[in-house]
Amino acid sequence: TRLQKKVKYHRRSISGRKARIKRDGERIMAYLKIFPIKVTDKKALDYITNPDKTDEKLLVSSFGCSPETADLEFSMTREMAKKNGMDKGDNLAFHLIQSFKPGEVDAENAHRLGQQFADEVLKGKYEYVISTHVDKNHIHNHIIFNAASFVDHHKYVSNKRSYHKLCRISNRI
């Protein structure tokens, strides 16, 4: 039922990792949260590219795919990984949220920082779509990236160690 779907989604989002990045005891820029997408990446991609939230899609960009067809391209990459025996785990993609304090950055700089962050984290191996949402009082980036690499077909490993690496990279940028 509809309620069960909401509860299931809520449980998945709670299982995501999140933390405010700190340096020398003081809070700085980004608040990070990552969680797996296990059921459908199309709905998540539609949500993050919503024109009402992204300044009419001016704040949407991608790497290795087109934002409009990313779900199909992600799927084709996963199929190739499966054919090569590299499709382990049930994660289709990962959803990363990078939030900034109100007034800390403008939309264009937030988007640029998000792109730099995604490029450094994913090292040109994973397709991704990034969007910057400006519909709330805090500007935030949504980055959805394929769980399977289009270069070597290995799956992205999300654990505490990889999460702390994400925090360090975001902190540096």
Question: What is the predicted function of each stretch?
Answer:
Residues 3-173:
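N-terminal nicking endonuclease/strand-transfer module with a His-rich metal-binding environment
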